[in-house]
């Protein structure tokens, strides 16, 4: 099964490369701007034949992507293997304005006693007193993204292919 998936990925890369790729720095800037313009993603996790996709608000702190959550079934996949896929997208209004970002990477649970956790909570505007009064633990999860696929119909007018790929790992 793993060999079949690996073969399909190789075929996809060989036969479907971006036609007119953007320079890497310009693509990174475009991805950053897209993420800054949105605040909700669909996060998919899984293990074995079980998968879960959850809509979540996200925030960015020091260029990193985080979610805050009280828990739920998404943690089954996060604890099992950490592998995630996430998507951020605009409402569909036609091919010319089609815009979405698919991301693949790893979910990293942030220790609630760490400085990183405090930074994320503060960036979200949550006070320590509020955390103590909550009925459930507020978990912070960092999404370490290694692969981005941006689909943006507006790129065609700039001379680039609508589909752009940024591989960081």
Describe the role of every protein-language-model region.
Residues 1-23, 98-169:
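Charged, gly/pro-rich active-site loop segments
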Residues 32-33, 57, 76, 131-133:
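Short secondary-structure boundary/capping segments
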Residues 94-96:
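Short, charge-patterned binding micro-sites
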Residues 38-71, 78, 86-90, 99:
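Short beta-strand segments
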Residues 90-91, 145:
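Short secondary-structure boundary segments
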Residues 19-40:
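Short, basic/aromatic recognition patches
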Residues 36-42, 122-125:
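Short Pro/Gly-enriched beta-strand edge/turn motifs at strand-loop
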Residues 71, 82, 155:
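A short beta-strand motif that forms part of the nucleic acid-binding face
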């Amino acid at each position: 099964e793993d060999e079949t998936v690996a073969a399909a990925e190789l075929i996809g890369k060989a036969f479907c490369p971006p036609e007119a790729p953007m320079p890497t720095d310009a693509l990174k800037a475009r991805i950053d701007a897209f993420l800054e313009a949105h605040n909700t993603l669909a996060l998919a996790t899984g293990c074995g034949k079980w998968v879960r996709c959850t809509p979540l608000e996200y925030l960015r702190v020091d260029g990193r992507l985080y979610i805050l959550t009280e828990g739920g079934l998404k943690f089954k996949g996060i604890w099992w293997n950490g592998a995630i896929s996430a998507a951020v997208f605009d409402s569909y209004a036609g091919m010319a304005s089609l815009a979405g970002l698919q991301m693949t990477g790893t979910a990293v649970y942030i220790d609630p006693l760490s400085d990183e956790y405090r930074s994320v909570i503060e960036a979200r505007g949550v006070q320590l007193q509020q955390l103590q009064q909550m009925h459930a633990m507020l978990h912070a999860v960092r999404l370490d993204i290694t692969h981005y696929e941006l689909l943006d119909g507006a790129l065609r007018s700039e001379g680039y292919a609508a589909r752009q790929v940024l591989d960081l790992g």
